[in-house]
Structure formats: structure tokens, C-alpha cells
Amino acid sequence: MIAKYIIGYIATGIAFAAIDSIWLRNMYTRLYQPEIGELMMKGGFRMGPAVIFYVLYILGMMIFAVGPALQSGKWQTAALWGALLGFFCYMTYDLTNHATMKVWSTKVTLLDIAWGTFLTGSASAVGYWLTTMIMGRD
């Protein structure tokens, strides 16, 4: 049983990182740089906080979306609960920034919330699917 959750964590992490990297590579210069560029670090990002975010967020995806899907045997459980998790987490981040920062655009808020919803839902579903392909559905 624990092996299934370890595989699930790894599979979900790979799915999340792969999908998110496509978005970040394409939207960094199209969305974030033009809209909130003055808030961003020049030449990259801090690796430590990024790794901590990924490790803990994927754990949250396992607890709230992929784990329940592994118990129910339904990918739709992972997709729905993952999408809801993504919506609430990204909404909290974006609306807090929108409310407290001088430079934060409505465009970034809306697109980032939509992205977080899609990303977390789809990565949860893919993580569930990969796990069941590797470990079976018992």
C-alpha cells in the first residue's frame, strides 16, 4: 500500500513539473514579465523556495486528490479534487498579491488562477493514471 503512494507521489510530481514547465517557459515573457516584471528577480529564481513549494504542494495533491482517487479507483476524483485544490491555492496566492501589492495585474490574477486550476487537476489525474498503470488498481 505504501509503495502505491510513493509511486503516486513521484508520478504526480513528474506530471506537475512537466506540465508546469511548459506554461512557465511560454508565459514568462508573454505574461509575467510584461505584467509584473518589476517584481521579479533578474536572471532566474531562488531554487530553495521553489523546491520546497513543489515538494509540499505535491504532498497536498496526494492528500487531497490523488490519494482519494486511488481509494475510489476513479481518475475523475483526482481531476475534480485536484482542480478544486488548485483553484483555492492559486486563488489565495493571486488575490492576496492583488490586494496587497502596488504592481499586480488583474490579468495575471485571472490567468494564474485558471492555470492553477487546470494544472493541479490535470497533473492529479495524470499522476493517478500513471500510478495505476505501474501498480495496478487493486
Where does each model-flagged region fall?
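Juxtamembrane/disordered regions of integral membrane proteins
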Residues: 1-115, 119-138
